């Protein structure tokens, strides 16, 4: 009970410390599907990677809105933890369907769809998955000084239970690749550490410089670049915690925070090549 009372006091203190809204100026803002709320689920990795794929297709002129409930249905008897690469592997094995065919409310109510209908064509979930995300289309990047740079490495993380490989590059190179990818109008899936004091969904901002090793605890899609009133560089993050913050669910992450607290990013190979 004392612990609960202390928690209430801490929450009240944080609420009183809410910062005034910072006015950001967009330099790049990519189109996106509506922001969702993952609730108590552990599926941030699915929300973020699907959002990245959706934005890529919107930029190509396709209207694609993918079902997170379908992914939850597929993995319900497996490990619920994962990374962006986990999502890519799952849809490569089991397919994906549209949000309209299997909305978020369907998980416990409707059977798993056998077909996807899109633009007058009929697909199996696996055929549809290959049409929205070709095998090998995305690549995974990390920056970890425990491994050699320039090599593909297996990150020793609980969420990487599939033992997926990541191209290991220096922090500054990773940051540059992310910025150039966004400026060339490609979405990026970000995975990293949101447990630092500089991260506040309530304020909609993640900022700070850190020397500590990042932990892997959240994923978001990067959908833009902006500047704060001091002309500092920020990345516009599409979160999956609903819309109850000053930016309707978006967050602004400083370049310094992203540089120091990134575990991995996922982008198309085209985005990586144009970002060289």
Where are these regions (language model features)?
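Structural recognition of the beta-strand scaffold that forms the well-ordered cores
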Residues: 43-46, 70-73, 87-90, 98-100, ...
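A short glycine/serine-rich beta->alpha loop
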Residues: 30-41
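Papain-like cysteine protease catalytic cores
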Residues: 64-127
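Positively charged n-region of N-terminal signal peptides that target proteins for export
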Residues: 1-4
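Active-site nucleophilic cysteine motif
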Residues: 39-53, 79-89, 218
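N-terminal regions that are enriched for targeting/export leaders
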Residues: 19-30
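C-terminal motif of bacterial Sec signal peptides marking the signal peptidase cleavage site
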Residues: 14-15
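Active-site signature of cysteine proteases
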Residues: 19, 33, 112-276
């Amino acid at each position: 009970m004392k612990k609960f009372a202390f928690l209430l006091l801490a929450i009240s203190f944080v609420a009183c410390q809410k910062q005034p809204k910072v006015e950001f100026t967009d330099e790049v803002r990519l189109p996106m599907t509506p922001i969702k709320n993952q609730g108590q689920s552990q599926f941030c990795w699915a929300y973020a990677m699907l959002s990245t794929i959706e934005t890529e297709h919107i930029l190509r002129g396709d209207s694609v809105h993918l079902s997170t409930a379908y992914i939850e249905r597929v993995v319900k008897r497996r490990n619920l933890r994962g990374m962006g690469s986990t999502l890519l592997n799952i849809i490569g094995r089991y397919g994906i369907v549209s949000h309209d065919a299997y909305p978020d409310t369907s998980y416990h109510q409707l059977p798993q769809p056998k077909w996807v209908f899109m633009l007058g064509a009929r697909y199996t979930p696996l055929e549809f998955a290959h049409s929205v995300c070709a095998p090998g289309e995305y690549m995974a990047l990390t920056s970890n000084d425990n491994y050699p740079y320039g090599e593909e490495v297996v990150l020793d993380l609980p969420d990487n239970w599939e033992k997926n490989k990541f191209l290991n590059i220096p922090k500054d190179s990773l940051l540059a690749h992310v910025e150039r990818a966004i400026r060339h109008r490609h979405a990026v899936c970000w995975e990293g550490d949101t447990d630092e004091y500089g991260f506040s969904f309530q304020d909609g901002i993640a900022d700070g410089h850190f020397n500590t090793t990042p932990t892997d605890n959240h994923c978001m899609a990067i959908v833009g670049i902006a500047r704060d009133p001091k002309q500092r560089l920020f990345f516009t993050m599409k979160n999956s915690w609903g819309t109850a913050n000053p930016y309707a669910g978006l967050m602004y992450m400083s370049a310094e925070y992203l540089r120091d607290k990134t575990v991995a990013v996922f982008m198309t190979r085209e985005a990586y090549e144009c970002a060289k």
